[in-house]
Amino acid sequence: MGSQRRALAVVALGLASLLAGCAAPEPWVKPYERERLADPIMRLSRDALADKHREHIYDVRESARGATGVQGGGCGCN
Amino acid sequence: MVATSGSSIWMRRLRRALARRPHHLMRAGRALGVVGGVMAAGGAYAIDLPEDRADAMYHFYDGGGTRADGPALLIRKKVADRLSISGSYFIDSVSNASIDVVTTASPYKEKRTEYSLGADYVYRDAQVSLSGTTSDEPDYKANSVSLDVSQEVFGGMTTISLGASRGADHVGSRYEGMFDRAQHWRYRFGVTQILTPRWLMSANLEAISDNGYLGNPYRVAQVFGTLVQERYPRTRSSRALKLRAVGDIGQGEQRAALRAEYRYFWDNWEIKAHTLEVGYTRYFGAEWLGEAFVRYNTQKQALFYSDNAQSETLYVSRNKQLSDFNDVGIGAKATYSAGKIADKFDVKWNAQYQFMRFRYKNFTDIRTHGLYSFDANILELFVSATF
């Protein structure tokens, strides 16, 4: 029991000494470096209405559904 | 209702941030000290609302004996500093002579009408979206509400989103009227992360829970070569995980984006599916934008699926959507920017086409006893205006 506590103390001290050299990570891509990311071609969904049509077609014909990153549900699919 | 995803929130924010120059940030940093500098680069400003926009679309699907087409409209408008509302209208005119229908019943036509209303509210680095959808066809009525919240953190590099939807359906048939109900719950969680000045990625997880009548009153199963009414479980629990990455691979002034998406889906009917999509988008001059993409989906059958069951079981279905199959799609999209009209409306004309091929591994055409497959053509023509 005592040896377990000593081992834990050593691990805790070791971790503390490792973390002592670290600062909290800062955002590494500054707003003024995001010009290319702001272009419309970088959007995950550019045209909501066309994407909705596409998702409806997939939902009706494939079993997989969900996790598209948009609100869903409500289609009559039988 | 399709609402803006977390990723588009920070896209809007990026455009706003780009209006500010690096030296402005440095000046702010000097004036306010190190903490102030970090704040200026980080989350000291509110998110912009989605831009005002109107879309009018004609959509078309033709494949496997089913043809569906119709118009769709979407309009979104800011009504206050922090509030934007949206509405959409979607018509599906369906002419159904699919293999399920022609082998067991008569082809039919029907119309589905869907209305959606939504509201987006922004406060500092957060956005709250509420929407409601109602879908109506003669033998199926569906209503749903959704609530989503997203929050930017870590200097705008990370967006976290949480959401839930609740759906309630009335299920019927042309012969019996409305005879049963179904309910759906959806819970979703997503993270979008800027990786480098050129690359970002997102991860989305969604859990879906359904109960009630989940089958189709027109479809039949086959047991010992005899056609019988299909028997579905009344509950289903599904999970989906989707990973996406998109990057700008253009050189110099040229902008070109490469995107890759992968989704793994699994549920307690023992269906497992993998979906992969890769797309490439680039500008052709100042007015044209072109996109090409390929998509592949493969799935393993549900536990109770059988083309022709050789034993009596509690549940049995011959729904080809639950069988072993794969489908591939290849598509292209072109966008033409027509410029400003009436000094206010930024108009774009769009055309998108996709060819799909479905190949079933254990679903046969009972007329020929051969494995079934079909091709589909999908088209969207739409004009959009931002203002």
Show where each model-derived region lies.
Chain B
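Cleavable N-terminal export/targeting peptides
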Residues: M1-P50, F387
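Short glycine/proline- and aromatic-enriched beta-strand/turn motifs that initiate or cap beta-hairpins
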Residues: A44-S86, M356, N377-I378
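Short loop/turn motifs that connect adjacent beta-strands in outer-membrane beta-barrel proteins
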Residues: Y45-E51, R82, F154-T158, R198, ...
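Transmembrane beta-strands of outer-membrane beta-barrel proteins
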Residues: D52-A56, I85-G87, V128-L130, T158-L162, ...
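Transmembrane beta-strands of outer-membrane beta-barrel pores
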Residues: Y58-D62, I91-S95, Y123-D125, T134-P138, ...
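Residues that define the transmembrane beta-barrel architecture of outer-membrane proteins
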Residues: R67-P71, K111-Y115, V122, K141-V145, ...
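Residues on the lipid-exposed face of transmembrane beta-strands in outer-membrane beta-barrel proteins
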Residues: L73-K77, L117-Y121, L147-Q151, F189-Q193, ...
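Outer membrane beta-barrel transmembrane domains
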Residues: D100, T104-A105, I208, L214-V246, ...
